């Protein structure tokens, strides 16, 4: 299941750059960049911190596309 995120859009809405967002949530600029590109899936804790920093829910910030052939148990 691919994980999609809207971090870049929400970060831009707040007017903060990757460095500032990283500082707000305690990670590097490179980590923020990797998350935005989809190269890194954040931990639950980091996802919660990012959502709080962006003033949105985790569900608004991160979404996954469900594979219709894959059962969720």
Question: What are the functions of these language-model segments?
Answer:
Residues 62-73:
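Short, charged recognition helix plus adjacent turn
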Residues 12, 26, 37, 66:
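Residue-level detection of the helix-turn-helix DNA-binding "recognition helix"
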Residues 45-60:
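DNA major-groove recognition helix of helix-turn-helix/homeodomain DNA-binding modules
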Residues 7, 21-22, 32-35, 61:
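Conserved hydrophobic/aromatic packing and binding residues within compact polymer-binding modules
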Residues 27-41:
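Recognition helix of helix-turn-helix/homeodomain-like DNA-binding domains
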Residues 5-24:
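Short basic helix-loop element that most often maps to the first helix and adjoining turn
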């Amino acid at each position: 299941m691919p994980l999609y995120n809207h971090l870049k859009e929400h970060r831009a809405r707040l007017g903060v750059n990757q460095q500032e967002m990283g500082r707000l949530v305690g990670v590097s600029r490179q980590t923020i960049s990797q998350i935005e590109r989809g190269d890194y899936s954040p931990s639950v804790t980091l996802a919660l911190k990012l959502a709080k920093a962006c003033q949105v829910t985790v569900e608004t910030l991160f979404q996954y596309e469900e594979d219709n052939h894959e059962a969720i148990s």
